[in-house]
A protein has these predicted regions:
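Glycine-rich phosphate/pyrophosphate-handling loop used in enzymes and phosphotransfer proteins
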Residues: 1-221
């Protein structure tokens, strides 16, 4: 057996539960990269850790757009997670897409009646990177997913300041007929929740096109 993150040989005595039920098998080193967010201790809006009431950012969004995203973050966006996303997303180590498949699968069970939609890359960004960092992880999970949105080419989010991200223009268009999503529930999935601007844009557009409910799930917060 190999570590689901670094792919090194993993020497581990499996329990009966691990034999019969899927779990992420990570070596000791890789296990330290991911700190799970305790959902009961997270903001009920954006999922910010250690904020059991709506945080200041969510209250500001509520004033600005009239609703609050219901986001769930799986892991802390800390040094360990940043190391993973640097190696996976920016360096392009595609093997790392399976690092937390079991945790992702478990989280998706809470959205059984939702259309799962990974946040898209622009065609130019996809051509440069060679893969969508979100859909590549979702490919290893059980539920099907759908590309409901398309993205225009804009400057990468990682190159923008917080203020610039918050002022970003609507980068998405809906790529399916309205009839396909009208009165549906949609789960938007992204890698990291930073300001929330990207996910808010996606949610706003879906609501404008008749979607009943939009929730979001991010790998890190």
């Amino acid at each position: 057996m190999r570590c689901s993150c670094c792919q090194k040989e993993l020497i581990k005595n499996l329990t009966l539960l691990e034999l019969f039920f899927q779990s992420s098998h990570r070596c000791f080193h890789c296990q330290q990269l991911f700190t799970v967010i305790e959902q009961k201790m997270a903001c009920p809006g954006c999922g910010r850790p250690n904020s059991v009431e709506l945080c200041g950012d969510c209250l500001q969004w509520q004033k600005q757009i009239g609703f609050v995203l219901e986001n769930r973050g799986l892991f802390y966006y800390d040094a360990g997670f940043r190391k993973w996303i640097e190696d996976y997303k920016f360096t392009g180590d595609y093997r790392l897409r399976g690092a937390f498949t079991a945790e992702l699968n478990q989280a998706l069970k809470n959205y059984r009646d939702y259309l799962i939609c990974p946040m898209p890359l622009s065609m130019e960004r996809f051509a440069t990177r060679g893969f969508n960092q979100v859909s590549s992880c979702l490919e290893l999970t059980n539920p099907p997913f759908h590309f409901l949105l398309a993205r225009k080419e804009l400057a990468p989010q990682s190159e923008k300041t917080r203020a610039e991200r918050l002022k970003m223009e609507q980068p998405f268009t809906v790529k399916v007929p309205k009839e396909k999503i009208r009165n549906q529930r949609v789960l938007l999935v992204d890698d990291v929740y930073t300001t929330g601007r990207t996910l808010v844009h996606g949610a706003e557009l879906l609501y404008q096109n008749g979607v009943k409910t939009v929730k979001t799930l991010t790998f890190a917060r």
